[in-house]
């Protein structure tokens, strides 16, 4: 019996919507990353994008434990001398709440073209409204 290898053109991708209200950042991000990779499917193949589309709503209401809200710092570097910028979790969740979950999930996906393709299937929205109703996403309880 031969090992099954999924083909990119035959992979069936479903759409799911996840409500992030009151959820812990890391626990939610690990489950989303696993679903984006397709590890929950029987036909998972490491070098093929077999994951589903995930729409996350209420990203502004995501939580972290302990004092991480004040202590967790996100860095960005422009490439120029003195171009290192930092922002704490508290300030970033007010300014760009979608970015927090995207950064967390991005670190859990493979690095390279396949990981970037998986990350494109993640849609994060700060509020309850999203514009993917035409895809009829199923509610995913995490």
Curated annotation (Swiss-Prot):
Pfam families attached to this UniProt entry? Ribosomal_L13 (PF00572)
Q: Which UniProt keywords apply?
A: Ribonucleoprotein, Ribosomal protein
Keyword GTP-binding part of the UniProt annotation: no
Assembly and partners are described as: Part of the 50S ribosomal subunit.
The family note in this entry says: Belongs to the universal ribosomal protein uL13 family.
Q: Which NCBIfam families match?
A: rplM_bact
Protein name, as recorded? Large ribosomal subunit protein uL13
Which species? Answer: Tolumonas auensis (strain DSM 9187 / NBRC 110442 / TA 4)
């Amino acid at each position: 019996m031969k090992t099954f290898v999924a083909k990119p053109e035959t992979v069936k991708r479903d759409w799911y919507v996840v409500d992030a209200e009151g959820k812990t950042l890391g626990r939610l991000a690990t489950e989303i990353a696993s679903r984006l990779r397709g590890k929950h499917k029987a036909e998972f193949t490491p070098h093929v994008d077999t994951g589903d589309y995930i729409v996350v709503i209420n990203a502004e209401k995501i939580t972290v434990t302990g004092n991480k809200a004040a202590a967790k710092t996100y860095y960005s570097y422009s490439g120029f001398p003195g171009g290192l910028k930092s922002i704490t979790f508290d300030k970033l969740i007010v300014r760009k709440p979608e970015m927090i979950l995207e950064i967390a999930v991005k670190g859990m996906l493979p690095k390279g073209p396949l990981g970037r393709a998986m990350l494109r299937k993640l849609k994060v929205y700060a509020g309850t409204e999203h514009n993917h109703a035409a895809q009829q996403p199923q509610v995913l309880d995490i």
